[in-house]
Structures are given as structure tokens and as C-alpha cells.
């Protein structure tokens, strides 16, 4: 059990504002390749109560029901713990959510997105808590999924960058990734209602959809707090692509540099990241990276589209006290100059060694190495979802009053 200590009182029955009993909320999941969709689900869940507890499944449980995870359980525990709406993390949470689990952690109800999670034998993992009326649903974030991110890594295309349209090659891959190579158990008997949810025999929950950028989403993720007197303003800059525990470890170390830190993260434009990273980087576009970083508890503010070189204007505008960089190589600006020349001149620059060796490149290498396993995992997952939808259709089609 890992407590963050940033939320409301965690004890069962503890009185919250106005003398009301604290409402404790439970979420659980794999939280593999954590992205802003996961963060948004946890944000919505936290808004339904006062204290959010998140259970994270083990590698063994995930492999049994879905297939191999990209990240280890220890990495996944740390990532969830870093999300600012999470008050407590429960490692090794059971894959099937039961009333026993909710009662053990004194939770009033659990929250899950409006998609389906199935066991290895095709059963709804939330069936028991749904029947007991201790289940709440929140909206799934459209336009981001592990499937989509894996597809971007495997195809060397820049179609996902903010200024470009999706290529036909990427769309073809996105449409076929995880699609069963054989007819699904549903065959051609899917009802029109179900068929509308899964065109082309695809599950409505496993696949790729378009993410629509809105200012409201940024507002929901942002803290909205200005630096206060006595706080130390620390500036960091980079791509923060596929926001991962390497970034979290770095930001956590930066956060420790001051008694009252106010950390500002400057995110570079997609084209700038591609200049110094090459290939098809960044994997996530600027808007997606912004939401991912805003969800981190160690970050107070984000500069969207920050200049590559840290300028005097930027330092003066934000009244920056300290500028930090990790142990990754510092690539010169387009004109060959040092991007940290100004903070170095002022004597406010320092490099941080977080102790983590994980990089975005290493994550992509993991995916490419295990490509066939991940594709097989999605094929298996989608086949189960389609079978579940067909079972629902048959149940709805059964004449009322008919018994087995």
C-alpha cells in the first residue's frame, strides 16, 4: 500500500468538509503504458469522491488474462503513484473486482470507464460490484489507447504530429491492429446495434479513434495555481514523450531541490523534437504530451511549445530561480549554440541524475522486440470482446419469459 498524502483524509468514515463522511473511491487496472486517457479516468473518479485508491494488477495476472505487459509491475506502481489525483496505490490488486476488495479498503464504490474488461474466460470483471450497485462509470477518453501508441511506434510515420494528417498507411495499420485473423464467434449474426458499435467486425473498445483537442481538457488537467511568495520556481524543458517513469524519477528529484518547489515544464513543438530526436519522434504530439505532464503531481505548470533555447525573456517572465536538465545529451540549437547558455551565465543551471536509465527509445525497443506478442494480445482481447457483445445480443433477442 502506497500513500501519497496529497488528498483528503483516508480513514473510513473520516469527516470531510462540512462534517460529511469521506467518500472513498476504488479504481483498478493494468495501467500499462500510462497515458493521459488513464489520467483522465482517474481524474473523473477522484471527482466522484474525496479519496481515491487505485489497485494495480501484477505482471502474472495481466499475462494470464490479457498477455504480456510492456512495463513491469514496479514500474506501473510508480507511474500510477505519480498521477496527482491518486491518494493511494494498492499493489497486486486482484484482476476481478469483488465486494471483498471494496470492503477491505473501505471503499464506497468503484469507478471504471465505459468500456468492457473481461477475464480470460470472457466474464465481466466488474459483474459482482455492478449487481451490488457499487459501480460507477466515467467517460472513456477518445483518441488515445495503448493500441494506438504501439502502432505509432511500429510505423515510421509522422502522421500523428500535430500539423499533419493521418497517412493511409497508418490508418490501415490502425484499422487492422489486433483484428482477429479468423471470423469472430459472432460471425455475421451481430445485430445492427452491435454492428454499429464495431464496424468491420472490430470491437468498439480495442482500436483507434480520433482525439479532438480542446481547451477545456487542458483546464481540467491544470492546477490553475500561480507561484506563491516563498516558492522556488524551477524550470525544466524537453519532449517528455511517452511520459514514463524515467521522466517521473527526474521530476521527483527536481521537486526535492526546494522546500516549496513550483516546477514549470517547457514542452517543445513536435517539429523541434523531431529535429533533435529524428525518426518519427515524438510518438505523442504536443497536445497529448501536455496533458500527460500536467497529470504529474510534481509539475505545477506547463509551457506549451516552449523555445528550444532557454531565453532571458522566458527566465524573466516566469521569475525562474533554477533551471534543471537530466543526464541525457544536450543537443545544440539550430545555430549550434548551447540551449542552456543563458541560465548557465546566470549561475542557475544544474544537471540532475535521477538514477533511472529508462528512456523513450528503450520503451520503443521493448515494443518492437515483442511486436508479435502485443499483436497477439490485442487479437485475443478483441475476440473476447466481440464474443461478449454477441452474448449480450442473444440475451436481448431472447423472448421475454423464456427460460433455459
From Swiss-Prot:
GO terms for molecular function: ethanolamine-phosphate cytidylyltransferase activity. It catalyses: phosphoethanolamine + CTP + H(+) = CDP-ethanolamine + diphosphate. The modification Phosphoserine is found at residue 356. Pathway: Phospholipid metabolism; phosphatidylethanolamine biosynthesis; phosphatidylethanolamine from ethanolamine: step 2/3. The modification Phosphothreonine is found at residues 359-360. Residues 189-201 have a biased composition (Polar residues). It comes from the Eukaryota. Its EC number is 2.7.7.14. GO terms for biological process: phosphatidylethanolamine biosynthetic process. Keywords: Lipid biosynthesis, Lipid metabolism, Nucleotidyltransferase, Phospholipid biosynthesis, Phospholipid metabolism, Phosphoprotein, Transferase. Signal peptide: none annotated. GO terms for cellular component: cytoplasm. InterPro entries: CCT (IPR041723), Cyt_trans-like (IPR004821), Ect1/PCYT2 (IPR044608), Rossmann-like_a/b/a_fold (IPR014729). Belongs to the cytidylyltransferase family. Ethanolamine-phosphate cytidylyltransferase that catalyzes the second step in the synthesis of phosphatidylethanolamine (PE) from ethanolamine via the CDP-ethanolamine pathway. Phosphatidylethanolamine is a dominant inner-leaflet phospholipid in cell membranes, where it plays a role in membrane function by structurally stabilizing membrane-anchored proteins, and participates in important cellular processes such as cell division, cell fusion, blood coagulation, and apoptosis. This is Ethanolamine-phosphate cytidylyltransferase.
Amino acid at each position: 500500500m502506497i500513500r501519497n498524502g496529497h488528498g483528503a483524509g483516508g480513514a473510513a468514515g473520516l469527516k470531510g468538509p462540512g462534517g460529511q463522511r469521506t467518500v472513498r473511491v476504488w479504481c483498478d487496472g493494468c495501467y500499462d503504458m500510462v497515458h493521459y486517457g488513464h489520467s483522465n479516468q482517474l481524474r473523473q473518479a477522484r471527482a466522484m469522491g474525496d479519496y481515491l485508491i487505485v489497485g494495480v494488477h501484477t505482471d502474472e495476472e495481466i499475462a494470464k488474462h490479457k498477455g504480456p505487459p510492456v512495463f513491469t509491475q514496479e514500474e506501473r506502481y510508480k507511474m500510477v503513484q505519480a498521477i496527482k489525483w491518486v491518494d493511494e496505490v494498492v499493489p497486486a490488486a486482484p484482476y476481478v473486482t469483488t465486494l471483498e476488495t471494496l470492503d477491505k479498503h473501505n471503499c464506497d464504490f468503484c469507478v471504471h470507464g465505459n468500456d468492457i474488461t473481461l477475464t480470460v474466460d470472457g466474464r465481466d470483471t466488474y459483474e459482482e460490484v455492478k449487481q451490488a450497485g457499487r459501480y460507477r462509470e466515467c467517460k472513456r477518453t477518445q483518441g488515445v489507447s495503448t493500441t494506438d501508441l504501439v502502432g505509432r511506434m511500429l510505423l515510421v510515420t509522422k502522421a500523428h504530429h500535430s500539423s499533419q494528417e493521418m497517412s493511409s498507411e497508418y490508418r490501415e495499420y490502425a484499422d487492422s491492429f489486433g483484428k482477429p485473423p479468423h471470423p469472430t464467434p459472432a460471425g455475421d449474426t451481430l445485430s445492427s446495434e452491435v454492428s454499429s458499435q464495431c464496424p468491420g467486425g472490430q470491437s468498439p473498445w480495442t482500436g483507434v479513434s480520433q482525439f479532438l483537442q480542446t481547451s477545456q481538457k487542458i483546464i481540467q488537467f491544470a492546477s490553475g495555481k500561480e507561484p506563491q511568495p516563498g516558492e522556488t520556481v524551477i524550470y525544466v524543458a524537453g519532449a517528455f514523450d511517452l511520459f514514463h517513469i524515467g521522466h517521473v524519477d527526474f521530476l521527483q528529484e527536481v521537486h526535492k531541490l526546494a522546500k516549496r518547489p513550483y516546477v514549470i515544464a517547457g514542452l517543445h513543438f513536435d517539429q523541434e523534437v523531431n529535429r533533435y530526436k529524428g525518426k518519427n519522434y515524438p510518438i505523442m504530439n504536443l497536445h497529448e504530451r501536455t496533458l500527460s505532464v500536467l497529470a504529474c503531481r510534481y509539475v505545477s505548470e506547463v509551457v506549451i511549445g516552449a523555445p528550444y533555447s532557454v531565453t532571458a525573456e522566458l527566465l524573466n517572465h516566469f521569475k525562474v530561480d533554477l533551471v534543471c536538465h537530466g543526464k541525457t545529451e544536450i543537443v545544440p540549437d539550430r545555430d549550434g549554440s548551447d540551449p542552456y547558455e543563458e541560465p548557465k551565465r546566470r549561475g542557475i543551471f544544474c544537471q540532475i541524475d535521477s538514477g533511472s536509465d529508462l528512456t523513450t527509445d528503450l520503451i520503443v525497443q521493448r515494443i518492437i522486440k515483442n511486436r508479435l506478442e502485443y499483436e497477439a494480445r490485442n487479437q485475443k482481447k478483441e475476440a473476447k470482446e466481440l464474443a461478449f457483445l454477441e452474448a449480450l445480443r442473444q440475451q436481448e433477442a431472447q423472448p421475454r419469459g423464456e427460460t433455459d
